[in-house]
Amino acid sequence: MRRTAISLTLASLLVSSASWAVVHPGVDLTDRYIVVLKKDASPNAAQQVLAAIENQRGAVLFRYQHTLQGFAVQMPLTALQGLQHRFPDIDYIEPDLAVQAMPRGGNKPNNGDSGTSTEPPQTTPWGIKRVGGFVDMSGDDARAWIIDTGIDDKHPDLNVDARSGRNFSRGKPNQTSDGNGHGTHVAGTVGAINNAMDVVGVAAGVTVVPVRVLDNAGSGTISGVIAGVDYVAEAAASGDCANLSLGAKGYSQALDTAIKTAADAGILFSIAAGNSADDASLYTPASTVHPNVYTVSAIDNNDNFAYFSNYGSDVEYAAPGVSVLSTKAGGGTVTYNGTSMAAPHMCGVLLVTRGQPSMSGYAEGDPDGNPDPIVHQ
């Protein structure tokens, strides 16, 4: 059932505290496709396909070399199908689709904004406490790769390695700042510094690396997400964690392959289950199954299963995803809701436990009747 024809509606998996939104439909990008070569295709064969695409005035948007061999291209499908007949090393072609982040109206900013703050110098959010508290990982070699909207590298509560970051969205390759806020919030839950200000993350002070695949409006493409995963596979080390708080309805074989290949190299993945109150197996990358890949549903502070959260057999753990306080782009903190917020709790625990998470209790009211264990250190 998971392997249905692709019909993608990628969105940053965050729910407004005022309106519990669901995924918005993606818009097909005319003449944009993902071309994947067979595993045993030689570098020379890949170069021949690339040259043929360029000779037919096709635009190569991304080239994938670390998790799979292939390209994201813009050219008519009929021309691509002609190339597929000419080059048997082409395994399959799938459409690239536009994606859009969810609205976030109604989220409440906290300290760091104008006016007198009533917050203590540093808050330990309820979600951090629920998964076992924070562990100081300042100076640790492990890193968290935030595949998202970028990260505010000037936020004083985050240890951001912007130099190792990359941009696969609009702008220059090294433009990884966050004009949206989603990625900065995710990064804070993973690793906000224990420094007597704002909040503290699960893996406090761990280095967070921005891999920008969504623009300032929260929009992106499946091809850009694959490019982000492909880069992480090249740059990350075994034991690092990549967080994917995004999702799409349907199945992308290329994205699934990219994640599994990176996971084979020891990179841990934490993936949001989705906010559509639906079976997570119908969404990508939530449906990716691998020992180093963890799909995460959301609970509230009473361990109740969040009614917006996706569910099902592809979900490994539940984590806090309602009224989650974390870092805000531009400084200070803000509260968000969504499985986007649950996944970084998991990522932090994976870093702290070196990929050996535990559990503490179960989500109450899981719609599939098989309650998800709540992740814990």
Please describe what each predicted stretch is.
Residues 33-36, 72, 94, 143-146, ...:
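Structural recognition of the beta-strand scaffold that forms the well-ordered cores
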Residues 61-68, 200-203, 210, 224, ...:
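C-terminal subdomain of the subtilisin-like protease fold in secreted/lumenal serine endopeptidases
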